Amino acid sequence: MISTEEKIEFLKRLVEIYSPTGKENGVAKFLIKSFENYGIEAYLDDVGNVIAVKKGKGPLILLAGHMDTVPGYIPVRIENGELWGRGAVDAKGPLATFFFATIESDANIIFAGLVDEEGFSKGAKNLEVPKPDYIIVGEPSGTNGVTIGYKGSLTVKFTETVEKVHGSIGVGAAEKLIEKWLTIAKYFGEGFNSLSGRIVKFVAYEREFDFFGEMIVNLRTPPGYMPPKEWDIIDFVPAYEVSRTSPLVRAFVRAIRKAGYKPKLKKKTGTADTNILGPKYGVDAIAYGPGDSKLDHTPYERIKLREYLEAIEILKNAILELSSND
């Protein structure tokens, strides 16, 4: 039996390894060494993902968390029962939860610590493991929450070139790009089933014979959305959702109730590796993990240690439910 203190110390050490996207190697080495300490072989795949396999009973379950964080170092400390640090919520708390659920469960589990989730999900897109029966992705849903849907993510580049005319007439490239943005933004709404977005890059300047402008936008897309074919698409990950009646969802509902909580099924307006891994393997995928997602990417990122420890037990019980019902 692994002690509470050991589980807290593991998470603290994991968060202390600063790992913005592209610099996940320190976390990878730590995970591989930690698995080996518990007698489980782990290795790096071709893109830098950490893979560990636990043999047991029941269906094959993929536990996929990510090792990278957004930039912005936060001094790591424990105060009032909370662990502060970059990645404590997004998503090293869930990753540590997956680590201990793998160690302590008597089930067929593939653990995957993925790279580049905060970038273009290179880790998920290039993951090559045997087809699982169920996929659980490590993202903060709250101890009593299960995320059953995420909006899609569409990154598009628009460019405009406008021949020079007298300054008192016509519009330049910047104005045309602004018109394009306003046309798109007319379709924005709130919630899971609406389009939303923001400008992530905008440059415009004068050249010798013309005006040039470039705008890159990121749109969060609802289920069923397909972009116009003429757009210059940099990256597109469609929306994803799983049925509330899925055996995977029902297993978590039972496990959360067993812990004394009322389950909350969530659909989020962000995007996660569920959007890639669910369609990639053609099986149901949800996201689960401790932490308040409102603290993602903020200077105030912190996780309640009690919730982290509870999430490990809930995840283990959900895995047990899946294994028992196979």
From Swiss-Prot:
Keywords: Amino-acid biosynthesis, Arginine biosynthesis, Cobalt, Cytoplasm, Hydrolase, Lysine biosynthesis, Metal-binding, Zinc. The keyword Repressor does not apply. It catalyses: [amino-group carrier protein]-C-terminal-gamma-(L-lysyl)-L-glutamate + H2O = [amino-group carrier protein]-C-terminal-L-glutamate + L-lysine; [amino-group carrier protein]-C-terminal-gamma-(L-ornithyl)-L-glutamate + H2O = [amino-group carrier protein]-C-terminal-L-glutamate + L-ornithine. Zn(2+) 2 binds at residues 90, 118, 297. GO terms for biological process: arginine biosynthetic process via ornithine; L-arginine biosynthetic process; lysine biosynthetic process via aminoadipic acid. PROSITE patterns: ARGE_DAPE_CPG2_1. Its cofactor is Zn(2+); Co(2+). The keyword DNA-binding does not apply. Transmembrane segments: none annotated. InterPro entries: ArgE/DapE_CS (IPR001261), LysK (IPR010175), Peptidase_M20 (IPR002933), Peptidase_M20A (IPR050072), Peptidase_M42 (IPR008007). Its EC number is 3.5.1.130, 3.5.1.132. It comes from the Archaea. NCBIfam families: dapE-lys-deAc, PRK04443.1. Belongs to the peptidase M20A family. LysK subfamily. SUPFAM superfamilies: Zn-dependent exopeptidases. Zn(2+) 1 binds at residues 66, 90, 139. GO terms for cellular component: cytoplasm. Its main location: cytoplasm. This is Putative [LysW]-lysine/[LysW]-ornithine hydrolase. It is found in: Cytoplasm. Pathway: Amino-acid biosynthesis; L-lysine biosynthesis via AAA pathway; L-lysine from L-alpha-aminoadipate (Thermus route): step 5/5; Amino-acid biosynthesis; L-arginine biosynthesis. Catalyzes the release of L-lysine from [LysW]-gamma-L-lysine and the release of L-ornithine from [LysW]-L-ornithine.
